[in-house]
Each structure stands twice: as C-alpha cells, then as structure tokens.
Amino acid sequence: MKLKLKNVFLAYFLVSIAGLLYALVQLGQPCDCLPPLRAAAEQLRQKDLRISQLQADLRRPPPVPAQPPEPEALPTIYVITPTYARLVQKAELVRLSQTLSLVPRLHWLLVEDAESPTPLVSGLLAASGLLFTHLAVLTPKAQRLREGEPGWVRPRGVEQRNKALDWLRGKGGAVGGEKDPPPPGTQGVVYFADDDNTYSRELFKEMRWTRGVSVWPVGLVGGLRFEGPRVQDGRVVGFHTAWEPNRPFPLDMAGFAVALPLLLAKPNAQFDATAPRGHLESSLLSHLVDPKDLEPRAANCTQVLVWHTRTEKPKMKQEEQLQRQGQGSDPAIEV
C-alpha cells in the first residue's frame, strides 16, 4: 500500500514539473494579440472624433441661406392700379402692396383719382419698399358716378389707367417715385390690378413671359363662380361668361396682361370712357390682338389665381353720432 502511494505521489510530482516547465517555455514566446487590440483602439478613437465633430456641428448656428441674385434678364411686371379716396382705401392698398412685395422685378404704377397726390397714398408708397411711380389725374365730372348709382353704371378708373399708359409711353406726369419711363427695348408686361381684388403671387409667374396678350380665369365675377377663356388644344376657342357673351373680349380687367413692347408699338391703344357698359376691356384689346391669338395661362385656363373680391362698405352710424356730439374719432389718426 505504501508503495503504491509513493508511486502516485511521484507521478503527480513529475506531471506538475512538466506543466510548470511548459508554462515557463510559453511565457517566452512572442504574442500575436497586439494587432487586433490596436485596430480596436483605432476604431474607438475614430468614433470619439466623429462624436466630437457632431457635437460641434450641433453647437454651431445654422448657416443663413444665400439669396439668389435677381436675374437681370427677368422681364419687369408693370402693375397699374387706379385708386380713389374712401374709408377702406388704405386697408386695400396695404393688402395689395404686401402681395406685390412678394413678386420680384415689379414696378407699381399707382394712380390716384385726384388733382394732386394725397399724403395717405404718398406715405403708403414710401413705406412699401416697392419700386413705384405715383401718378394722379382727376376723373372728369361727366364720367363720375352720381349719388346712389351702382358701380357698374359707368366705367371707373379709365382716366387713371390711361394716365399710366401715357407714362409708359414717355409722356411724363409722375408726381412721386420713379419718374423716368422704361427705356426703348425694355422687356416687360403690363397688368391692370384694381386695389380691391385678391391676387395669388403665382399669377405673376404666369404672366411674366407674355409675348402678346395672355389670359386666365377670374373668380367670383359676372354672377358666376368664375369667368374665363375656354381652351382647346392650347388655343382660346371661346369664353365662359353669362353676360353679353358676344362682346369682342368678354374678359374681366383682372383677366389679362399685355406685353410692354406691344403696347408701345400701338400708341393709340387706350381705354375708351365712352365704350358701352362691359366693353371697357374690349376697347383696349381690340387695338392689340385678335381673340384667336390670345395666350392661355394658368394651366390652359383651368386654375383661378385672382378673385374679384369687394370689401364691404363700413357702417359709420356710431361715428356719425359721436361727431354730432363733438366726440368723434381723432382725425389725426390715419385709418
């Protein structure tokens, strides 16, 4: 029994010595585990660097987008607006001026129905930030609406629109703003924008490249949801209208634009104050174009981008009552 235990102990001792010698030998061998460790460390370093860059980007304020320069080749839109003194005049003109301010390369020709410019309109134009020309001409008494007459009985704004056409043709008359007319050869388009309508800025994109006379529908006019040209195969073949459809050009004043070179080439083309009711637009267009040559815009006249809106006349009963008591609103406050 002792012999056997001695042998077991000896065997255990020899195996232990062999294992120890093997371990000592392995400690002296080169290790190939360093390259993976170096690669992992580099990946961590790159991730830390990327995180630092992202944190710096988040702290940096966003860059202000650069405004593209206004292309000089873009034709100018000359917007002719007749206006007259009334309680809602300033409100109408503020709304219109802020729409026009969204349109690049636009020149506003604002024509007062007055002998001379008024401070209200002069101040509004100066504050508008628009390129403008201020004109004034009084409507003759024989052409003015009489008390109680509806607005459609007599054509309105005739003298004022013709005054603006005269200025474009170099006949002067400006009382404020830009006083020199466009030089010969100027590419542009002329649009007649009443001060009480509602305009989408998309409308001005549609008209800008007019070659002759461009046309489109007008909403809320003529007792209809809209009036406008009927188009087939890209050409105007008729008009959707209910009142006197046989007029030469059954269009609303807001429903067309004219190329400036065409107007300048036809010096006698203007609005006729003696034209029959509803024929004012035709009195100008008949000098400029044949109906078959009209240029349909607004997706072949299927989009309404201008509306013939009207601001309700304010009721001033309380104001009149206070005025009789000597307590009316301060007249020095412009409304």
Curated annotation (Swiss-Prot):
Residues 312-335 are annotated as: Disordered. It is found in: Golgi apparatus membrane; Golgi apparatus, cis-Golgi network. This is Galactosylgalactosylxylosylprotein 3-beta-glucuronosyltransferase 3. The chain crosses the membrane at residues 8-28. Belongs to the glycosyltransferase 43 family. Glycans are attached at residue 300. GO terms for molecular function: galactosylgalactosylxylosylprotein 3-beta-glucuronosyltransferase activity; glucuronosyltransferase activity; metal ion binding; protein phosphatase activator activity. Residues 1-7 are cytoplasmic. It is an enzyme of class 2 (transferase). One of its GO terms (biological process) is positive regulation of catalytic activity. Mn(2+) binds at residue 196. Glycosaminoglycans biosynthesis. Involved in forming the linkage tetrasaccharide present in heparan sulfate and chondroitin sulfate. Transfers a glucuronic acid moiety from the uridine diphosphate-glucuronic acid (UDP-GlcUA) to the common linkage region trisaccharide Gal-beta-1,3-Gal-beta-1,4-Xyl covalently bound to a Ser residue at the glycosaminylglycan attachment site of proteoglycans. Can also play a role in the biosynthesis of l2/HNK-1 carbohydrate epitope on glycoproteins. Highest activity seen with Gal-beta-1,3-Gal-beta-O-R (where R=naphthalenemethanol or benzyl alcohol). The lineage of its organism: Eukaryota, Metazoa, Chordata, Craniata, Vertebrata. N-glycosylated. Its cofactor is Mn(2+). Keywords: Disulfide bond, Glycoprotein, Golgi apparatus, Manganese, Membrane, Metal-binding, Signal-anchor, Transferase, Transmembrane, Transmembrane helix. The gene is B3GAT3. One of its GO terms (cellular component) is cis-Golgi network. It is a single-pass type II membrane protein. Its EC number is 2.4.1.135. The active site is at residue 281. InterPro entries: Glyco_trans_43 (IPR005027), Nucleotide-diphossugar_trans (IPR029044). It catalyses: 3-O-(beta-D-galactosyl-(1->3)-beta-D-galactosyl-(1->4)-beta-D-xylosyl)-L-seryl-[protein] + UDP-alpha-D-glucuronate = 3-O-(beta-D-GlcA-(1->3)-beta-D-Gal-(1->3)-beta-D-Gal-(1->4)-beta-D-Xyl)-L-seryl-[protein] + UDP + H(+). Liver, brain and heart. Moderate expression seen in lung, skeletal muscle, kidney and testis. SUPFAM superfamilies: Nucleotide-diphospho-sugar transferases. Pathway: Protein modification; protein glycosylation. Homodimer; disulfide-linked. Interacts with PXYLP1; the interaction increases the 2-phosphoxylose phosphatase activity of PXYLP1 during completion of linkage region formation in a B3GAT3-mediated manner.
